């Protein structure tokens, strides 16, 4: 099932990587319903993996999954593979635009417009940590807290992620808030993530970051309150 390029380092490395691939697939099948694994199964069938030496890998991360070509480039012996395989597992390559998990990419002339990449990356980190004990990037702590709160409010968040269903998530959030508020919430997660990934948050960014964080947290509290209120009203009507 798993295809390795001619650039593999040696049989030992290849065997270790093969074990990681099997560990990933088994864990996903144990954890999630089969209906949520259609993209994983489709993409694993045609996945190509390139194991590279560090001097050949000109990229700030230790692994990278290409959504369009369904190729994974990774440094030898690195557990970042689990994060990237989660990206693979929710990559809808049949869509004319690239939809991967909660992230949407639209090509407009020479530019690529993205939306909800922050939510997608953070939730991928959360799942990689939960399922495979991958350490979460410490610079994204606050955004992780917000997305964990979101997960508590949206019970089927893992299923929406694996089925690349951002639309359904927005509709769910809009049941108790407005559509614009829901889209703003997702956009603000993007902004927070972008600031956090700078690693060195400049002094002038701190106030902006704090304001965006408070606004994003308020949205979640507002959603929870309005949902609880509506559910309580329904219960009272049944009495």
Q: Language-model segments: which ranges?
A:
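Non-Sec secretion/translocation targeting segments of pathogen effectors
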Residues: 2, 124, 237-239
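Auxiliary, metal-adjacent structural segments of Zn-dependent hydrolase domains
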Residues: 2-75, 95
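Hydrophobic (often cysteine-bearing) scaffold residues that line and stabilize catalytic clefts
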Residues: 13, 17-20, 78, 82, ...
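Active-site recognition of the HExxH zinc-binding catalytic motif
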Residues: 79-96, 121, 125, 129
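Generic alpha-helical structural element
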Residues: 13, 17, 74, 88, ...
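Post-HExxH zinc-binding segment in Zn-dependent metallohydrolases
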Residues: 102-152
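Pan-zinc metallopeptidase signature
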Residues: 137-239
